[in-house]
Amino acid sequence: MTDVTYVRKACAYVTRATGELLVFEGPGHDGLQIPKGTLEAGESPREALFREVAEETGLGTLNGVSHLTTDVWTRRRSPPKRYVRHFFHATVHEPRDRWVHTVRDGGDEHGSAFALRWVRPSRAGEFALDLDDYVHLLPSTPPASDVASVSD
């Protein structure tokens, strides 16, 4: 029997007032991606969410953050790896339709340029790595909630 490695991830469905979903394309990533990343030692999924969104998008303020679900996704190629994925939803007030963000932190992604844009949730089928699995859990209208910033 082969040992399986478990990796904990925080995944962010970030939307804006129009209901559009933030996605990006970048080097080393196949297909459309959402902000996501591996939890660091001692970090909670929520803390990782704020860090990853800031690192990969440059956005520093997230509104109405809510946990949607947690699953286990298995990469079947050798060596097998299981990802414990924590999916969150957050809204932002972002007027730009498209922008390029260069990662300043983020370890292996440092210096990578991500091309960010907004898409309708109906385009989620184009997402890589089954990242579209829980788009159906997004509210039909963005919630008006408390504001939480990356520094929280």
Go through each PLM region and give its residues:
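A generic structural signal for short beta-strands and their flanking turns/coil linkers
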Residues: D30, N63, L68-T69, R82-H86
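N-terminal strand-loop-strand
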Residues: M1-I34, R46
